[in-house]
Amino acid sequence: MKLSNMTAFLSLLIFILLVAIEARNLVGVERVELPNPASMVTAYWQKMLPHSPMPTAILELLNPPTDVNQGVHGNGYDQVYGNGYDGGYINGYSHSYSNGYSNGYFHKANLHFLEDALKPGSIITPYITGIATRAPFLRRDIADSIPVSTKNFADILAMFSPISLVMADGIQSALDTCEHHRPIKGEERACATSIESVVEFAMSVLGTRDLRAFSPDVPPEGIMPGNMYKVVAVRTVAGLRGDTVTCHTMRFPFAVFYCHAINPTRVYAVVLESEEDGSGSGSGTPEKMEALAVCHLDTSRFDPKTPLFVEHNLRPGDASVCHFVSRDSVIWAPVAAVITHGDEQVSIAE
């Protein structure tokens, strides 16, 4: 481990220990159990979104693996998937979305590509981040009673104790992002702590209750740059109106989504086939997968130092910027904007 990383780790450890001592002295803070009201979430979804099958990103939170809750308390799961490859839009969000795209997320090399790359036969090296966590939903009344604020950090540690260091780091970063996010002009965003608040935000931004939700069929651990894939097929999922909302899970003891919209956008379902020898079962590199690519069409307010712009000698506004989304992401689009192909809707991970 590098000295700088070791110093940062020790600083975090000392900070967590101090907060833990403070949390022990808190009066009136009750420990929160992690109920998983799957039937309530399902009933709400069917009532509010009768035209949208539940996407995998939501389904997998209804019946999370048993080691997820253990991971919250330090038994591995968040160690495997929670680091998000050290700095994508999983590891803290405060390094990713919170600074108007001036660094972090939009400065990750290989993360972005031009829309022209999405042509059958093209060879690309996709960068798809791993999932943040698979923490269960809380009932809305319980979730709403927990202020998403940095000053509430010690309370949250006490409510969900014991908490692993990785999870504590995720909580701190999520709270900081939700409280101090600095969006680019025109961006709409929210931290949603229940299924109801996720759906309500999407409906509010898109101006309709008639929505469809999509998630990609990609590995939970993501795909690191360097693995070559051929673009086998491309289908436009949403783009008739150009407005979508994207929600990503954040590392937290219960399901918390970072939802935002930087419109106009186009969304593509992209079938990718590995060009690597030995890919497939047991290799960690899937032979074939169906990903979701989001293309931001108006990049005039993006940072000119975005690696994609620098690499292609482009200025903000010269071209659209595309990126793939992780397995735990949900993309929302008005039903009227969803592209149909023949008599069938696209089937990607609904």
UniProtKB/Swiss-Prot annotation:
Keyword entries, A-Z: Signal
Pfam families (UniProt xref): BURP
PANTHER family to which the protein is assigned, alphabetical: BURP DOMAIN PROTEIN USPL1-LIKE, BURP DOMAIN-CONTAINING PROTEIN 10
Annotated protein name in UniProt: BURP domain-containing protein 10
Coiled-coil annotated residue ranges, if any: none
Signal peptide segment: 1-23
Reported tissue expression: Expressed in roots and panicles.
Domain BURP: 112-335
Organism field: Oryza sativa subsp. japonica (Rice)
